[in-house]
């Protein structure tokens, strides 16, 4: 019987163990998409206790707590202490067997806290609380201290076009910080013209860009100014959360002006008008990214804020999102082609939340590759509900079967937690085990030089090259 979570966790043969321990584990982390707070990095936040750093803002854990019947006051309540929330989590973790949270929890205790050989639960919670809190009181366990322990080389935060990026500038000016912290442009509120807050948001964009927006060209001018601001602060990428992927041929400016005017006047837009406006903004933005050498990321297929009662109580990003099932292939093809037809398609990473769309993306990327940039269009790693063992394996296998796994830019945390870097370890173990199994079965050569180069490229080198090449 195998022992739970040894140093060889998930590594089933000698080839896999060699690939992981000798080549994957030492590689730095290039975490090109996350939701960390740049202010917390700039301020080098110190955490009061394990409950705070572990549970604050982590909607993966919040969903598990709710599924275990825990009262909301012990999940997001302001009236309960960090310790009370922590003990609720300790009582819940033994119930998460089979869920990646069980693995992640114990990986996070191993690194950076060094707690091994102990199962987390109500019987061990007090001892672990004390041990971890003692370490959190030291400089090595500040926000940046943890990042340095985990060998993080770069993080890409997620930032709204109206953000000042003051903390990114503060970080860049601080010679004591040797981690690159790059903003990523997230313009969801710009192209989602159908949302209730669209008009109010345009007012904020006007103020940030110092441009009055009444016509579509005004919007272009405002966005150009903000794109320039992001570029000056070291932006390398954009990101777009797309629940429903729409496409319509882009109309002329007169029609776009009319659509925008209707929305500003409070009138209801038709589905066609929404699709026309959304497509126009995305295609124009994509061309701007291409000109700047940025990467365009499209996260497709979430249904967000499903629970109206809890949305009214807690707001967005609190654990009430799930997988959508809209068809995406035709609209995605047309959207990418609208940029590529003028040779203005940027480097692009496509992510799907519904795993049934894996093959759609794995084949779509082959339509739009280009010379000079290996893997110009990427099928991104298993996202959100898919960043678990089966989801990662599906993505790796389908990419390898329909594209070039060797050119893959690898894993990202997509997380709000400074303890989530062990997800890179989880991914690397799964990757090495997959290659090790193929080699053991004679499906690929047992060639250490060839396999080790591929592992190191996927773990770090490919992403570093991809995001920095113009």
UniProtKB/Swiss-Prot annotation:
MF (Gene Ontology): glucuronate isomerase activity
E.C. no: 5.3.1.12
Membrane-traversing stretches: none
Entry keywords, A to Z: Isomerase
Catalyzed reaction equations: D-glucuronate = D-fructuronate; aldehydo-D-galacturonate = keto-D-tagaturonate
InterPro entries in UniProt: Metal_Hydrolase, Uronate_isomerase
GO BP, sorted A to Z: D-galacturonate catabolic process; D-glucuronate catabolic process
Pathway: Carbohydrate metabolism; pentose and glucuronate interconversion
Pfam families registered for this protein in UniProt: UxaC
Family in the record: Belongs to the metallo-dependent hydrolases superfamily. Uronate isomerase family.
Identification of the protein by name: Uronate isomerase
Lineage, highest ranks first: Bacteria, Pseudomonadati, Pseudomonadota, Gammaproteobacteria, Enterobacterales
Gene responsible for this protein: uxaC
